[in-house]
């Protein structure tokens, strides 16, 4: 067994961690924004095709980076993502068959079309079924109509019941020959034909 003095000597031989560790001046904000921008670019099939054409998917470090980026699927990070398809494509990029298939332009077009059809049809149809609809209001039973003697209405009561005219109704009462459409000669410009 080693004496305590010998153990003290061994402890001094262990290198201490460097004192000049790098500290991010903005607390990781720039890295966060760069990763957010990159992951949202993955929502574009043309960009994935570009990465495949330039053989990024053959680099093991890049594949590891794509695996690392899966932390964006956690709830505390997903709230920052504006294009949720990027997470779907990130999941697909974990499959090597998908990575190699995206190098072909026809597969890029297929992915782009499927994405478009999802936005056009599925999402809207799905929302129709998800959003709550108000229940139809029950129609109250109408009381039986009692025979009554018809008296002519008083003129003041009729005037009080007539609704006020809206501005659109006032415009209909104006004549079609509005002075704004008249030229200096008094001819309606809307009705004038060329060549006369």
Swiss-Prot record:
GO annotations of cellular component type: mediator complex
InterPro entries per record: Med31_sf, Mediator_Med31
Segments for region (Disordered): 1-24, 133-196
Keyword Transcription applies: yes
A single MF term (Gene Ontology): transcription coregulator activity
Acidic residues bias locations: 1-12
Matches recorded under Pfam families: Med31
Compositional bias ranges of the Low complexity kind: 156-167
GO BP annotation list: regulation of DNA-templated transcription
Biased composition (Pro residues): 133-155
Subunit organization: Component of the Mediator complex.
Known function: Component of the Mediator complex, a coactivator involved in the regulated transcription of nearly all RNA polymerase II-dependent genes. Mediator functions as a bridge to convey information from gene-specific regulatory proteins to the basal RNA polymerase II transcription machinery. Mediator is recruited to promoters by direct interactions with regulatory proteins and serves as a scaffold for the assembly of a functional preinitiation complex with RNA polymerase II and the general transcription factors.
Similarity field: Belongs to the Mediator complex subunit 31 family.
Protein name: Mediator of RNA polymerase II transcription subunit 31
Gene: MED31
């Amino acid at each position: 067994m080693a004496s305590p003095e010998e153990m003290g000597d061994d402890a001094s031989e262990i290198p201490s961690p460097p004192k000049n560790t790098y500290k991010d001046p903005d607390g990781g904000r720039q890295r966060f924004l760069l990763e957010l921008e990159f992951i949202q670019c993955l929502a574009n099939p043309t960009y994935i095709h570009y990465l495949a054409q330039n053989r990024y998917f053959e680099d093991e470090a890049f594949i590891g980076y794509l695996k690392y980026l899966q932390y964006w699927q956690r709830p505390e990070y997903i709230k920052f993502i504006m294009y949720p398809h990027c997470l779907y494509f990130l999941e697909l990029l974990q499959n090597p068959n998908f990575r190699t298939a995206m190098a072909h332009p026809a597969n890029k077009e297929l992915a782009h079309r499927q994405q478009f059809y999802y936005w056009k049809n599925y999402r809207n149809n799905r929302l129709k079924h998800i959003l709550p609809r108000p229940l139809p209001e029950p129609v109250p039973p109408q009381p039986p109509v009692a025979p009554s003697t018809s008296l002519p209405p008083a003129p003041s009561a009729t005037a009080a019941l007539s609704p006020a005219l809206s501005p659109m109704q006032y415009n209909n009462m104006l004549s079609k020959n509005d002075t704004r459409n008249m030229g200096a000669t008094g001819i309606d410009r809307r009705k004038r034909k060329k060549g006369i």
